[in-house]
Amino acid sequence: RFRDRIAAAIRARLEVADQELVRRGTTLFSLPMHAADGAKAIWGTADRIWTALGDTSQDLNWYTKRATLSAVYGSTVLYWLGDNSPGHQATWEFLDRRIEQVMQFEKLKGSLRENPLGKALMAGPGKVLERIRAPKLPDDLPGRPFG
């Protein structure tokens, strides 16, 4: 399941991190003058996870996937910093609950899309939102596929 791959990616990211360094970095990024850099770091992690998992979205989904994963990842990091359970088991359970909540929200969005009233309400905003595209990166950078 895709949700298991996302959980595994977040877990792998946290397991290679030094908890004390992350704690200190979180403290630094909580200061107003560094908050934008902290948000950029979380967004970058979410982007790398989605890219590693093969995300090919080019529309609004590109942004919503990364925003949602940023929220899940950020909250999981904060939980992980305070977790003293053996093997961080409480953190992994917390992560599973967050992903389950995202899945419930996605199901709700799907049911709204299928509902005639939901379709009617989203017709106008949908026309505007379908114009949003993922950013285009230069294809001549190292590590980027050509094409």
Question: What is each PLM-predicted segment?
Answer:
Residues 33-55, 63-70, 74:
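Amphipathic alpha-helical packing segments from all-alpha helical-bundle domains
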Residues 7, 29, 37-39:
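Amphipathic alpha-helical interaction segments
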Residues 25-32:
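Short linear capping/connector segments at secondary-structure termini
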Residues 12, 16, 48, 52, ...:
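Solvent-exposed, charged/polar functional surfaces in cytosolic regulatory/catalytic domains
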Residues 108-147:
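Long, charge-rich low-complexity segments
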Residues 55-120:
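Hydrophobic/aromatic-rich alpha-helical bundle segments in the mid-to-C-terminal region
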Residues 1-23:
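Hydrophobic alpha-helical connector segments
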